[in-house]
Amino acid sequence: TGILPAENRTDMARRIYESDTGEILMNSAENGFVLTTPRLEGVLVRETLPVRADKLEVLSSSVPAMTAAASLDAAKPLGESSHLLVVYSTDALNSSMRFTSPDRTVIEEVGELPVLIRTGRAKIAVRNRALRNPAAYVLGFNGERRERLPIRRTEDGKLLLEFDTGNFAGGPSPFIEITGQE
């Protein structure tokens, strides 16, 4: 017997590491990272798709991105929340930012505003049974709704979002709100 529970997926030979609570899973061999908590789930998408947590699944992404879904209802888990925030965070750098090498580990010049955000296309599914008639909105950096996005429920009950951040009105944003239609 060891410190980790028997169902823990840690496999050092395959460079897979899971926390003792099961909330964090890192696959070093595939540059993957999955965070699973009752109200927040996130995945790091680099190369291998699809990537799935428990309720959140990234079916496709045209660029590397961190994707997360969070319940905005204080006491409700992600799958039962009627108000969600999805974050699709791609590469973001200050204008004129410079590094000492291509791997960008040491900053040579911090750069200046505006921040340049890499655009991307993604297909994201969230298993949620509370939102019967969902509506999705791109949010600006100030939290205001900028435009409505198409969202649909699949036959197996998932909420499905497909979007291209390069086509958002007002420019790219990593933030999408999902709520019941008003």
Residue ranges and their predicted role:
Residues 157-182:
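C-terminal beta-strand-rich structural cap/linker in extracellular carbohydrate-active enzymes
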Residues 143-151:
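Surface-exposed loop/edge segments in extracytoplasmic proteins
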Residues 129-130, 142, 181:
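Surface-exposed loop/turn and intrinsically disordered segments
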Residues 1-138, 154, 160-162:
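Long, low-hydrophobicity ectodomains and other hydrophilic envelope-associated domains
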